[in-house]
Amino acid sequence: MESKLNETFFRQAAQKMLKNKSVFGAVLCVESGDSSISWLGGVGNIKAEDRYFIASVTKLYVTAVLLMLRAENSLTFTDKIFEYFPEELISGIHVLNGVDYTKEITITHLLSNTSGIPDYFYYDKPRGKAVTDLVHGNDQPWPLDKAIQRVKTLKPKFKPGQKGKIHYSDTNYQLLGAIIEKVTGKWIGDVFKEYIFQPFNLKDTYAYQDINDTTPVPMYYKSREIRAPKYMASITAEGGIVSTAKEAMVFLKAFFNGCFFPKEALGELKKNWNMIYFPGQFYFGLGIEKLWTPRIFSPLKPIGEVLGFWGQSGAFAFYNPETDLYFTGTINQASGFGHSAAYKAIIKIIKSV
């Protein structure tokens, strides 16, 4: 494996990501389970050690925290979410065909994106989407109460837990973050620090909070450089962690090697997969994603599972058990047009083993 997966090979794989016209800079980190393979590089306008927004990869950190809180008997995944919120805030968040299903929604429904609750960020409205405002320079915070207020004006996608139904919704993770804060009595950024950042000595990883902090590299939306400090500071559980590819790798390896929860719990996370088609095409389980890798991509040798999480910013963190290879980094393009560059690099490396 090591003879082919060398410095030149990895550098070429990273450079190839820049051939996507939407990608202006990228970071790629690849490691094997035993670290006999370990490569880190930056191309374009991003350096290997740069901090970047990991965006929705943050949700994998939420999964880890929830599993640890469950192990402490602080909560169960079958808990009804209305138990954690004031009635005036949560009531009416899921009204479908005149029936309020709010009290049927569980933590599992949120964690698996099967609640049916609309996504406040991407949902079409006459006045446009929150994401549209953001990329056109209208940076504004979206705290939980504001997100819920918008969601209550929208029609749910389906009943909570309806068989075969799934809808990717950032609202679900806003709610999960609030539940974590309720259980611990702490801001979720401090919970991340206590449960993950400090135990693993992650000195370049933190929950974005200071809107004057310009340390993270700016994201791009198509050719436009965007900075949205107010928004990023308001969505900690949904996508507000800042990290580096190297430190995201430390977390990823810990996640899949039983450092946060027994390795057997991975079976629970992978028990039920549903295909999501927006904001990308991939499978979603219980707080975890799996890349869509049809056999036609590798007819002679199946790719196998590629598990982890995408971020809308182009951040990624994935693990392929078959080759025991881990991948972290970012293509730093929030339009969705650059994700294929990272996907192709990951698949190419796996196929080369």
Regions found by a protein language model. Give the residues of each.
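Catalytic loop of the DD-peptidase/beta-lactamase superfamily, centered on the K-T-G motif
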Residues: 1-42, 49-53, 83, 164-165, ...
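Active-site helix/loop module of the DD-peptidase/beta-lactamase fold
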Residues: 56, 71-122, 153, 178, ...
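Well-ordered alpha-helical segments within folded domains of soluble proteins
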Residues: 60-64, 171-177, 246-250
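Short, charged, amphipathic alpha-helices and their helix-cap/turn boundaries
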Residues: 28, 32-40, 83, 124-160, ...
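Short, contiguous, well-ordered secondary-structure segments
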Residues: 152-164, 174-183
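The feature captures the short pre-catalytic strand/loop hairpin that immediately precedes
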Residues: 148-158, 221-232, 299
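Extended low-complexity intrinsically disordered regions
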Residues: 1-22, 109-141, 270
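Short active-site loop at a secondary-structure junction
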Residues: 19-25, 44-109, 159-169, 236-239, ...
